Amino acid sequence: MKKYDYEARDSASNKIVKSVVQADSENAAAKLLTAQGFVPLKIELQDDKTNFFARFSGRITTKDRVVFTRQLATLIGAGLPLAQSLRTVQEQTTNKRMQEIVQEIISDVEGGKSLSDSFAKHPEAFNKVYVALVSAGETSGTMDDSLKRLAAQQEKEAAMMSKIRGAMMYPSIVLAVIILVIGFMLFTVVPQVEGLYRDLNKGLPFVTLMMIKTANFFSSLWWLVILAMIIGGYFLAQYLKTEQGIRVKDTFKLNVPMFKGMFRKMYMARFARTGQVLLSTGVPMLDMLRITSDAVNNVIISESILRASDKVKGGKALSASLSNEDYFLAMVPQMIKIGEQSGKIDEMMGKTAQVYEDELDEEIRALSTMIEPVLMVFLAIVAGTMVAAILLPIYSLVGNINIR
């Protein structure tokens, strides 16, 4: 089966949905979407190259998880037995690792285990938020609704991360160009200039001399530089996996100039969106806080949530518990307080998440617009300095010839 990216309107909610569907052809994809209650607006064949690494590495992507969740929700909502629904979804997935996991889940379900317990055995595919929502769906008898909420939350999270990665793409390309320009000048042009002046027995300007020494260093010890980078990168990666390294990395994200606002809003949106989904499906407040502390994926924010959870356990309101936490933006406890007064905490957390998601979109666009000219100026300075270092001795040589 082929994978198709689609954009469709949900007939029930009238909302636009973007996701992935697996089918033999575009027409088959359209029919499948229509059967699931969607009005297809756009269907495009997915480039196989984008899934090449995922298929052969055994990695389960967000798209794999979203497709699985949406299809399972549709089948369960249509009244199919759980095991049969799982088998149908298993047949449609192209990810080998996902097929293996679903087969194990089918065996567990047929053996009498609950679906949530079966999912919990595979944390690499289904995190604690996923398991909690499925468990809530089992308790309330609204499994299909819980799965649809899960898919929607995962799509929002994936879209947000995609925008952040997209914003960093242009700066990465420009930095790569800068490195290539420097490498070309150091290893191609500079040695020729050095040879010319060595033959003429002429002195070199300081900038040119520094460039030549740099080029000679990298030419003779390039292997040492590469080895040092590999070893340094390995030890840095290992350090960042330690408890101290994780804390340093997460603290850095929350305080790094220019980007700290984006990171904080991203974590607030993640906390609020996850909390909204959990509470709306009947997950108790304390369980919601415990699960979101894992879901935010930042140890500093996680500790803030757990401290607030302890205060809530002692009888304090959630809004008051979060109001004194340094890294929680002020709007979060304010909106939660309104929710506490109206009895609609989940709705207010959803609105809070939407506000931060919208602000994050604007900041990402603004950052991209701001970074472009800064990088171009930096590139011009680097290239200009290197060109000047090469031309200065040439002008000096021409001047000496004219004087004579």
Give residue spans per PLM region:
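Membrane interface segments of multi-pass transport proteins and intramembrane proteases
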Residues: 195-206, 217, 243-261
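Bilayer-spanning, highly hydrophobic alpha-helical transmembrane segments
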Residues: 159-238, 358-404
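Catalytic metal-binding core of the metallo-beta-lactamase
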Residues: 1-173, 250, 254-373
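Non-catalytic, surface-exposed connector residues within folded enzymatic/regulatory domains
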Residues: 99, 187, 208, 243-246, ...
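Alpha-helical membrane-embedding segments
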Residues: 224-244, 278-295
